[in-house]
Amino acid sequence: MDAQQQALEVSAPYRLGLEIYYFREVVDEPIVSAVETVVHADAHIVVACKPHFLPVVPAGAYVRETLLTRLARRFDNAALVPLHRIDRDTAGLVLFSANPATRGIYQALFRERRIRKHYLAVAPPLPGLTFPYVHRSRLEPGEPFFRMRECVGEPNSETVIDVVARGVDTWTYRLEPVTGRKHQLRVHMAALGAPILHDRFYPELEDQRPDDPDRPLQLFAHTLAFDDPITGEPRSFTATVGPNN
């Protein structure tokens, strides 16, 4: 299809700058049975709580089984756009723009770091650290391409880590990403010697296997808070899933 959503004929001539759109098909797309929860919806934004194993947007083997596709159908709104993303294995809150006219001012919340995000994670104890603990490091693409790694150099990632519950074998941590690098929280916890429970990527890449609903990654995008750029009122949202759910 062209930019006017008209079908292109096989004989259509080449034109410099022509934009072409296509619908990607996936054979045997995995079905994600878990269901998302809409936490809030208004004329400008939608806040949804994503289950484990559901991608936010189409990627790889997933086209229809994504949070974006599900919400666009639910609200009959093709203009829905996620303002940030969380990993497929992570559960929790995702903020969407529902109105193109106001999208930019909500995107600015992330660009200008005016939004506060907190995660909960279950991982082995770190009795040797004093909390809250700030971990800074330089993250770069690793091997294979979808993993990240810490390396020597000027830090480009920062996470504030605190403890909210102490058990015998695991602790529950509150993680605040000051920056938003890919897999940042997972890499930082693994680097400290406390990889997040059931992490298939860190510290070592596990063999590929089907998703196990009994062993989801114990990482949850727990809260989102910001001053609404339209009304100026404080907004705060809490996930409907967590370590005890």
Residue ranges and their predicted role:
Residues 1-245:
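RNA pseudouridine synthases
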